[in-house]
Swiss-Prot record:
The active site is at residue 73. GO terms for molecular function: protein-L-isoaspartate (D-aspartate) O-methyltransferase activity. This is Protein-L-isoaspartate O-methyltransferase 2. It comes from Pelobacter propionicus (strain DSM 2379 / NBRC 103807 / OttBd1). Catalyzes the methyl esterification of L-isoaspartyl residues in peptides and proteins that result from spontaneous decomposition of normal L-aspartyl and L-asparaginyl residues. It plays a role in the repair and/or degradation of damaged proteins. It is an enzyme of class 2 (transferase). It comes from the Bacteria. Transmembrane segments: none annotated. It catalyses: [protein]-L-isoaspartate + S-adenosyl-L-methionine = [protein]-L-isoaspartate alpha-methyl ester + S-adenosyl-L-homocysteine. Keywords: Cytoplasm, Methyltransferase, S-adenosyl-L-methionine, Transferase. Pfam families: PCMT (PF01135).
Length: 225
């Protein structure tokens, strides 16, 4: 379904219009159906999470560079991973890899609280300031090794990892509630992975399924690369 611009629609340079095109073509057009995810993607201004010089590209469906040699994921992947978490409004979510803070902002529109861990100090500081200035008050950002999770606030209903790991970090598995979901890119290559969803069925019972092929920057840390 293509978004139809009304007669009084602003020009194509208008970011709200571009956001609607993103929703209809990149997300709904590729199978994203969760109303809460679509609403969150509509509410969060991606252009506020990229450098000034990149804002014209904010709603293109590809990653964009941010500080520290990292990237902000393409909108479809953010929506896909968020939908794969099967979230509810009461959930507490752990995000590994804050980056610019965009995905945390999207999550914050759906769930009760988001805890986000970023290993790079400049990114953690920038994301924290950006999220606070934009009013995302249910997000907490911590600078640290994301492969170890954030045990002080565990357990979590859902965990999402935004970098590729050689294997699922055991500390993250232990920080899931029973019934919780973990979505993470995993692969033998540091730049080519399969997106995996792990469900904690019981105290020591975890079931995993492959969702799709993805390409993420490496997950660096004690339990990563």
């Amino acid at each position: 379904m293509r978004y139809r611009c009304p007669m009084n629609c602003p020009s194509l340079r208008n970011q709200e219009y571009r956001r609607e095109i993103m929703i209809s073509e990149q997300l709904m057009g590729r199978g994203i159906r969760d109303p809460a995810v679509l609403a969150a993607m509509r509410q969060v201004p991606r252009e506020a999470f990229v450098d000034q010089g990149m804002r014209e590209l904010a709603y293109e469906d590809h990653p964009l560079p941010i500080d520290g040699g990292q990237t902000i994921s393409q909108p479809y992947i953010v929506a896909y991973m968020t939908e794969a978490l099967e979230l509810s409004s009461s959930d507490r979510v752990l995000e590994i890899g804050t980056g610019s803070g965009y995905a945390a902002a999207v999550l914050s529109r759906i769930v009760h609280t988001v805890y986000s861990v970023e290993r790079l100090e400049e990114l953690a500081r920038g994301a924290r300031q950006r999220l606070e200035s934009l009013g995302y008050n249910n997000v907490e950002v911590f600078e640290g090794d994301g492969t170890l999770g954030w045990p002080e606030h565990a357990p979590y209903d859902a965990i999402v990892v935004t970098a590729g790991a050689p294997a699922v970090p055991k500390p993250l598995l232990r920080q899931l509630v029973v019934g919780g979901r973990l979505v993470i890119p995993v692969g033998a290559s540091s730049f080519l992975q399969n997106l995996i969803r792990v469900r904690r069925q019981g105290e020591d019972d975890y079931r995993s399924e492959e969702l799709c092929g993805v390409r993420f920057v490496p997950l660096v840390g004690a339990e990563g690369w």
